[in-house]
């Protein structure tokens, strides 16, 4: 009988071989890898990389197969990822990125990026993404406010400095 750690090691090695260990990923490999990630997450639901890679693969399948069912499946797992990993900025930022890039719902993306910024471990890039979203939606006031908030946490952030200067001309 394999231990939990041995099973995880074998699953991750299989994923690595299927996804990165061959020169060309074959038709049908992504669904196999997705299922392997689901097995990994049954054993280790806190594995943030597994969640993010699996969701990315589902999004990729939606594009490659032109099948929105994969995208809706990815959305379901993105929400599940956040519910299991609600502490820290990373899951909130990832779900924000999911809605910004994959589902293209800027309103929801903004909500999740704003939630990510409540955490002290949020990096400058999270602020940058949110500023960009505010500007894309035409909300200059919130973009300026976000730049100022960013500079309180990261006083030497060149992006925030230049963007704030540009916006307050």
Residue ranges: model-predicted function:
Residues 49-129:
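Alpha-helical adaptor scaffolds
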Residues 1-31:
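N-terminal leader/linker segments that initiate helical-solenoid repeat arrays
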Residues 15-27, 55, 59-66, 96-104, ...:
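Short coil/turn linking the two alpha-helices of tandem helical-hairpin repeats
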Residues 3, 26-44, 70-85:
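Amphipathic alpha-helices of TPR/Sel1-like and other helical repeat/solenoid scaffolds
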